[in-house]
């Protein structure tokens, strides 16, 4: 070891552990390779050849996101193998809402101490998310930052790039109209938003125990990975069957639904038209959260909403195993109306 390496190690940065992380994650990255990827892991930049795609007028669409304080629960439970799926899901679900097929993904991990076994689990989850989305994991960065983070802490963010045929871009503001049917695709759980409130509600609970409302431990319920909707929606986008898409994340129904239609319309949602997952009932009960406010924070069991023409609604509902949760109407009051 050189003097400079020894000095760096004394400052808290373990270069050798960093090399080990790279060595460990290569097999996970390799599983995600797809047509268009150029080069191998370890270059200064990841490369992708767009010319191999059957797209006449390609439009690149990008998205970036993190996992929020759901990470704190993963760290507390020492369970790191699915949090990477969440990171990918938050990014690719956003770009599929614009009509994009995910092409590639990059991750960024910042930590107080490089622990190769743990970071391998995180990246394995990222790779699994990429597989579910059909995206290649073409690069990333792991930054060891002693003094910035405690040794056990880390943060995770991701960046997705996708492509859409210009004529198939989802433009709900232009295409969604009164009378269109709203179909809801079930969520897998809380997904990756609202966790600062979730942690507060369950701060004094034993996370390894269950609740009367749940069929598994509380921690397993809270760490259920975010569902990725790419493979369900992409074929329908290419068939021009979808007029608008809303990814129900932070801000719940009230913030995200209006992002897929114009100011002259309202989304009329019929409460009781889908199965609200037990974890949301538990949050409302134990957190003493107002029922109306739940729709302003959480997905309530619906992770993605699509607007479709009435004549296509029945077939698409069956194909997607979706719920018919409401319709678009001319605006007379708020942008989103929850009808009991």
Swiss-Prot record:
Keywords: ATP-binding, Cytoplasm, Ligase, Nucleotide-binding, Purine biosynthesis
Pathway: Purine metabolism; IMP biosynthesis via de novo pathway; 5-amino-1-(5-phospho-D-ribosyl)imidazole from N(2)-formyl-N(1)-(5-phospho-D-ribosyl)glycinamide: step 2/2
Single annotated GO MF: ATP binding
UniProt superkingdom: Bacteria
Primary localisation category: cytoplasm
GO biological process: 'de novo' IMP biosynthetic process; adenine biosynthetic process
GO cellular component assignments: cytosol
Record's subcellular location: Cytoplasm
CDD domains: PurM
EC number: 6.3.3.1
Cited Pfam families: AIRS, AIRS_C
Reactions that this protein is recorded to catalyse: 2-formamido-N(1)-(5-O-phospho-beta-D-ribosyl)acetamidine + ATP = 5-amino-1-(5-phospho-beta-D-ribosyl)imidazole + ADP + phosphate + H(+)
The family this protein is said to belong to: Belongs to the AIR synthase family.
Protein name: Phosphoribosylformylglycinamidine cyclo-ligase
Organism the protein comes from: Lactococcus lactis subsp. cremoris (strain MG1363)
């Amino acid at each position: 070891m050189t003097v400079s390496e020894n000095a760096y190690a004394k400052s808290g940065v373990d270069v050798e552990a960093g090399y080990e992380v790279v060595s460990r994650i290569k097999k996970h990255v390799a599983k995600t390779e797809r047509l268009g990827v150029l080069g191998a892991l370890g270059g200064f930049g990841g490369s992708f050849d767009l010319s191999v795609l059957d797209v006449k007028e390609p439009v690149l669409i990008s998205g970036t996101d993190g996992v929020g304080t759901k990470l704190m629960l993963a760290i507390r439970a020492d369970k790191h193998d699915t949090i990477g799926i969440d990171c990918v899901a938050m990014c690719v679900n956003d770009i599929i809402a614009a009509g994009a097929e995910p092409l590639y993904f990059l991750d960024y991990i910042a930590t107080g101490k490089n622990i190769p076994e743990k970071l391998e689990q995180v990246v394995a989850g990222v790779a699994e998310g990429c597989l579910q989305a059909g995206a290649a994991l073409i690069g990333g960065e792991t930054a060891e930052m002693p003094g910035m983070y405690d040794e056990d802490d880390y943060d995770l963010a991701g960046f997705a790039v996708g492509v859409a045929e210009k004529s198939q871009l989802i433009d709900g503001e232009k295409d969604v109209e009164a009378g269109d049917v709203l179909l809801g695709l079930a969520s897998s759980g809380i997904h990756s938003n609202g966790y600062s409130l979730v942690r507060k509600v369950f701060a004094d609970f034993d996370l390894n125990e269950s609740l009367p409302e749940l069929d598994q431990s509380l921690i397993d319920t809270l760490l259920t990975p975010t569902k990725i909707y790419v493979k369900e929606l992409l074929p329908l986008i290419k068939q021009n069957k979808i007029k608008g898409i809303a990814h129900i994340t932070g801000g719940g129904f009230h913030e995200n639904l209006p992002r897929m239609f114009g100011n002259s319309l309202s989304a009329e949602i019929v409460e009781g038209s889908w199965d609200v997952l037990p974890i949301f009932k538990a949050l409302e009960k134990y957190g003493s959260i107002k029922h109306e406010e739940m729709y302003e924070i959480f997905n309530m069991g619906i992770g993605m909403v699509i607007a479709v023409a009435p004549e296509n609604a029945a077939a698409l509902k069956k194909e997607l195993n979706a719920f018919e949760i409401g319709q678009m109407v001319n605006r007379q009051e708020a942008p989103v109306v929850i009808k009991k």
